[in-house]
Amino acid sequence: MIVTAEPTGPPATDAAVIEESWAAPERFEAIFRRHFGQIHRYLAARVGGRTADDLAAEVFTIAFAQRQRYDLARECARPWLYGIATNLVSAYRRREQRRYRALARMAAHGVAPSDEDLVADRVSAAAARPALAAALAGLGRGDRDVPLLVAVAGLDNQEVALSLGIPYGTVCSRLSRARARLRDSLGGANPAGSYGPAGNIRPVRGQKEQPSG
């Protein structure tokens, strides 16, 4: 018997996998495997590890239920998934603000928070600084979502725009406002771009700020 080898080539795009999942729901597992880790890390940085476990599962439950409405013109599902995640975070907005303010108070009084109380992953080191924690807490919802999608999720400005369903120029203006607020909170230090790994600040790759539209 002659066995025909499976065709080899680059992995199917997210859009192709999602389209296949319309008729074969089990194919959606590939989207979960590709993106769950990043989505969970983003949520952990926004709402803490315990809540992130539940919310990350909910992101993919919602995505699966809505997969037949996915825009197949978008080959990568990352912005879509981060948009769902950010919408879920909004339900925890007050809790998030209390977390940042508590971190700021504890740091100001020299009290070290437990690991469970720390904001996870890349933003944790930055959030533990009282001035920066207070600045993040003071930002409005939209102004806080933008820099954290850049900081924690590693999205560029265009991907943030797709995630939040807002114009590219609005992303740039919100990011600019957030940087200005953080600059003031850091005593004039220049946060010239997004947060990088371990709370470092670096320019957004290939992006120039534009007026909001």
Give the predicted meaning of each segment.
Residues 65-72, 83-105, 117, 125:
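Arg/Lys-rich amphipathic alpha helix in sigma70-family domain 2
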Residues 54-61, 75-87:
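Structural recognition of an alpha-helix C-terminal capping motif at a helix-to-coil junction
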